[in-house]
Structures are given as C-alpha cells and as structure tokens.
C-alpha cells in the first residue's frame, strides 16, 4: 500500500480549491515560519549541535538568521512580488492589456540534505509558500535531531491541509518520487541529483537541482598571506568543511604556498586553539560513513597541517595537504570535510586552464590585490557563483541568485529568486471583443498590402502614423 497517496491527494485538493492563493494566506504561513524560528531557537540550536556539533554562533549565522531574513524579506515584499508585471506592447496590441502573472505551480516537493538541515529546508520553503504552492518537505534522515523538530514541531505552525513533512530514507524518497509533483526542488550530491532528475523526467516535472562540486580558490602572489589564510580557513573549516560552497582546493604558486602554509597554521591555532579537538567552535563529521571516506583522503599528498582524527568523536582536525597530484582521490571528488589541498601552478593562465578542464563548480574564489586578476578569473571561467577576495559571502545577499551550472546544478533561489523559481510565469494578453475591422487585415484572402501593414503593426513598440 502506498503510504503517501492519501496525503498527497489531500494537498492537491487543497491547492485546487484555491486555499493557498490569497496574499493573506501566504502571509499567515510565512508568519508561522517566523514564530517557529523564534519560539524554538534554543531547541533548534541544540539539535544542530547534536547532529553536527555546530556552535551557537555557526547555527545562528548560517541557519537561523538566514532563514529569518528570508521570511522577513518575503513578508515585506509579498504583495509587490505577486503583482502582475506589465510588459511592452506592439502597435497591434496598444489598446489591449499585456502582463505576466506569477501563479503557483501547485504541489511542490522539497528534498533537503543534512549539512544545513534548517537553512536548506526553510529558505526554499519560504519561496514555495510565498509563491502560493502546497508543499511536501522531505528532511534528511541523517541529521536526526533536526529532522525530529521539523517533523514534530514545524507542522504546528503551518496549515496542515497545505503542508506536510514526510520521513524516511532512500527507499521512501524513491517511493515519493514515483508520484507526480508540479515542481521538485532538490539539494544534495550530483549522483542523487541524477536520480531525482530521472524521476522528474517521467512526469516532465520542472526541477531545481542544487548540487556541489570542487570549488577552486586561486591565490595571487601579491596577496597578504595572513589575510588570505584567515578568510580561507574560516570558510573551509566552517561546519567542519561540510558546506557545498566551501573551497575544495587552493591554486597558488610554490612561493605563495610556502608563505600560505604557516599563515594557515596561525589562523587555525587562533580560531581553534592548540588542540582543535577541544574547541567548541569546530564541528564534527555527520556520520561514520563520511568519517571513513574522509580518513581515506588524508593519505593523499603530504599532510602539512593537522591530519589527526578520532573515530569515537567523528573528529577530523583542520587539515592542509601539499604536494597533491591532480589524479589523487582528494582531487577527484568533492571533499565535504575539513581538508584543504594546496595545488601549485606557475601562473594565472595555468590556474585558469586547470579550472576549466574540470566540471563547472558551484562557487569559485580568487584572491588578489590587482583588480585585473580578479576580473580575468571572472571573465575566463564559469561557475554558479563567484567571490573575489573572500569566501561564500555572496551567499549572504538575497539580492544575488544562488545556484549551480552544469554538474553543480540548475535553477536559482534566495530572495525574490526563490519566489520566481516556484512561480509559473504566465503570459497573458487580454484583447477587446470589438474592433474587428482592424483584425480583418490578418484574415484571408491575403494581400501584399495587408501583410506590410500587419508586419509594421506587429513590430512597432509604440504608436506610429506610418501604416501604409
């Protein structure tokens, strides 16, 4: 028996009845999300600490505050986002009404990963709600403590005839994907992304895929090594490196590597102390499977910093690898952990060639005191996002779209981009039932004169007297 059938039917009936369409309903659900975040802040922080050993600081910055900001932005702008968008007209339609209507798709499925289990649930959910959809949330079964709150507490703040949280692992997710949805939003790795896309293709369901990849970080010789080290170490080891936009490797000259390694050691010691394992600010690996995978990568190249691990705590020290070969496993897969390989190149051209012969990344970073170098990297490469002289701060701007390209994903969200993602852009033209004399120009029998007049009328963007 299909355990999802009844619930999905209930949600679809609610959507078809128009329950989610009004601005008032959407605003009420968004306010519910806001109350959920404020009422359960401590409980959420405790769950994130239990799942990932996240500090209260990292939980606030990367999970709670970002989610709250998205809710607040949607509430402030909901009515303006929902308004019909007027468009330009040609001469033939000057007296008509032409506009784009942003209508909800219908029943949306959001599949969430474990690394930012609150952020990556609520941020797309805000967009889906604001756009007027009914939603099925599938949180990750791996981040168990956060999953429990999302399943047991979040529904109390939403209209349960329009929103549902479903639980389970890969088998249940596979069963869920057999059903027809009107939109699917998936965040996770490329392998599973292909499975989700294949399932969506059976029903021709539109989809957003937020995937990952190996994000490059180029460091120019003219940089201050300590400034670069501070910034790179922070966003590499944030959440124990389990971040889809974290730098996966650094490209720099041999000279810069020799300056960067001690600077990275200084930054790591400053951030996490002489024994990072005792630091309350360093996360842990999510589970045993990923811990063992990361341990295997520690054998690549040569360990310049860190390399220690503790299986009992699923702890891996902030690690820097040097003398890494491009063919080694650490350079063939997304690391998704607190390991940073340094790869030496002779110049900027070689670095760009190295980047371009790999799959397009979700994010790309470049450090230089020369703006021309930053502009060259930006102009000669492709990635989902780009940040010069820092890391993943572009993620904090709701005015910038977030998403991948190629194997790092498709589709965009954050801020109004989330609303647009979950909205069908419906092209609308409302014409007069009268004035049939003018329309006679387009009817048979066709003449060359009528063709000339009609072509002018269809091309002109404003009124014109030159009709003949």
Swiss-Prot record:
One of its GO terms (biological process) is aldehyde catabolic process. It comes from the Eukaryota. Pathway: Alcohol metabolism; ethanol degradation; acetate from ethanol: step 2/2. GO terms for cellular component: cytoplasm; cytosol; plasma membrane. It catalyses: an aldehyde + NAD(+) + H2O = a carboxylate + NADH + 2 H(+); a long-chain fatty aldehyde + NAD(+) + H2O = a long-chain fatty acid + NADH + 2 H(+); a medium-chain fatty aldehyde + NAD(+) + H2O = a medium-chain fatty acid + NADH + 2 H(+); octanal + NAD(+) + H2O = octanoate + NADH + 2 H(+). GO terms for molecular function: 3-chloroallyl aldehyde dehydrogenase activity; aldehyde dehydrogenase (NAD+) activity; aldehyde dehydrogenase [NAD(P)+] activity; benzaldehyde dehydrogenase (NAD+) activity; benzaldehyde dehydrogenase (NADP+) activity; long-chain fatty aldehyde dehydrogenase (NAD+) activity; medium-chain fatty aldehyde dehydrogenase (NAD+) activity. It is found in: Cell membrane. A lipid is attached at residues 462-463 (S-palmitoyl cysteine). The active site is at residues 210, 244. The modification N-acetylmethionine is found at residue 1. The modification Cysteine methyl ester is found at residue 465. PROSITE patterns: ALDEHYDE_DEHYDR_CYS, ALDEHYDE_DEHYDR_GLU. Dually lipidated in the C-terminus; prenylation occurs prior to, and is a prerequisite for palmitoylation. It is also required for activity towards long-chain substrates. A lipid is attached at residue 465 (S-geranylgeranyl cysteine). It is an enzyme of class 1 (oxidoreductase). Residues 466-468 form a propeptide. Belongs to the aldehyde dehydrogenase family. Oxidizes medium and long chain saturated and unsaturated fatty aldehydes generated in the plasma membrane into non-toxic fatty acids. May have a protective role against the cytotoxicity induced by lipid peroxidation. Short-chain fatty aldehydes are not good substrates. Can use both NADP(+) and NAD(+) as electron acceptor in vitro, however in vivo preference will depend on their tissue levels. Low activity towards acetaldehyde and 3,4-dihydroxyphenylacetaldehyde. Able to metabolize aromatic aldehydes such as benzaldehyde to their acid form. This is Aldehyde dehydrogenase family 3 member B1.
């Amino acid at each position: 028996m299909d355990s999802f059938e009844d619930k999905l039917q209930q949600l679809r009936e609610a959507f078809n009845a128009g329950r989610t369409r009004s601005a008032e309903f959407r605003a009420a659900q968004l306010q519910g999300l806001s109350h959920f975040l404020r009422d359960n802040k401590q409980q959420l922080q405790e769950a994130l600490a239990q799942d990932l050993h996240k500090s209260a600081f990292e939980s606030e910055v990367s999970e709670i505050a970002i989610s709250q900001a998205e809710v607040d932005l949607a509430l402030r702008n909901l009515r303006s986002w929902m308004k019909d968008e007027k468009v330009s007209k040609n001469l033939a339609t000057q007296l008509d009404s032409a506009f784009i209507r942003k209508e909800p798709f219908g029943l949306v499925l959001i599949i969430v990963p474990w690394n930012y289990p609150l952020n990556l649930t609520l941020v797309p959910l805000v967009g889906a709600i604001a756009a007027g959809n009914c939603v099925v949330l599938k949180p990750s079964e791996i981040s168990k403590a956060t999953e429990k709150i999302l399943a047991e507490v979040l529904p109390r703040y939403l209209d349960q005839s329009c929103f549902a949280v479903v639980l389970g692992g890969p088998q249940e997710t596979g069963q869920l994907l057999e059903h027809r949805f009107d939109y699917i939003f998936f965040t996770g790795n490329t392998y599973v992304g292909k499975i989700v896309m294949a399932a969506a293709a059976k029903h021709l369901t539109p989809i957003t895929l937020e995937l990952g990849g190996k994000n490059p970080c180029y460091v120019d010789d003219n940089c201050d090594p300590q400034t670069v080290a501070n910034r790179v170490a922070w966003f590499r080891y944030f959440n124990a490196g389990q971040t889809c936009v974290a730098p996966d490797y650094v490209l720099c000259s041999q000279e810069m590597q020799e300056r960067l390694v001690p600077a990275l050691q200084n930054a790591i010691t400053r951030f996490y102390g002489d024994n990072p394992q005792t630091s309350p600010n360093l996360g842990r690996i999510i589970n045993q499977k990923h811990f063992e995978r990361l341990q295997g990568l520690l054998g690549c190249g040569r360990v310049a910093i860190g390399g220690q691990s503790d299986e009992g705590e699923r702890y891996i020290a902030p690690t820097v690898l040097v003398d890494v070969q491009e063919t080694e496993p650490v350079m063939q897969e997304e690391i998704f952990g607190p390991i940073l390989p340094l790869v030496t190149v002779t110049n900027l051209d070689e670095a760009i060639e190295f980047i371009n012969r790999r799959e397009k990344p979700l994010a790309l970073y470049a450090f230089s005191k020369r703006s021309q170098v930053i502009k060259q990297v930006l102009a000669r490469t492709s990635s989902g996002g780009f940040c010069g002289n820092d890391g993943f701060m572009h993620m904090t701007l709701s005015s910038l779209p977030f998403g991948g390209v190629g194997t790092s994903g498709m589709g965009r969200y954050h801020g109004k981009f989330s609303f647009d993602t979950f909205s069908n852009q419906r092209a609308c033209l409302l014409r007069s039932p009268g004035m049939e004399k003018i329309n006679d120009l387009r009817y048979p029998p066709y003449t060359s004169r009528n063709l000339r007049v009609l072509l002018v009328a269809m091309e002109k963007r404003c009124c014109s007297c030159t009709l003949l």
